[in-house]
Amino acid sequence: MPRTIAKPSTISEGINRRFLEAIEAIVSLGKVSALEAFCTLYDLSAPRYREMRLTYGVSPKPGYQSRYKNIEVEAIYSLVVNYPISSRWLITGRGKMLIE
């Protein structure tokens, strides 16, 4: 039986993109040194998020489709609890990314 590959919803794609945008922001703010460091700190799979960055990142690789379709809940939790990132912005795209 062929494997069915589900296409992520536009909601999931938006959250994926905003998550990776937020990671870039905390790196540029000096809160964490790189995506890999964030993953190490919170026991996440760096290869997973590097691959997702090729599809959903700030500068995606044209035509590349990640095997991973969604950001893990643990990654979202770690981002909004430990950094000045708005959970409302991350989930809905409304408001500002950074919390003052």
Predicted feature residues:
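DNA major-groove recognition helix of helix-turn-helix/homeodomain DNA-binding modules
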Residues: Q65-W89
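A short, Lys/Arg-rich alpha-helix, primarily the initiator
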Residues: M1-L41
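Short amphipathic helical patch at the helix-1/turn junction of helix-turn-helix
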Residues: S28-L29, L54, N70, V81
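Helix N-cap/coil-helix junction residues
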Residues: K31-V32, L44, V58, I85
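Recognition helix of helix-turn-helix/homeodomain-like DNA-binding domains
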Residues: T40-I71
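DNA-binding alpha-helical recognition surfaces that contact promoter or target DNA
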Residues: E21, E51, T92
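Short, charged recognition helix plus adjacent turn
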Residues: M1-T10, V81, S87-E100
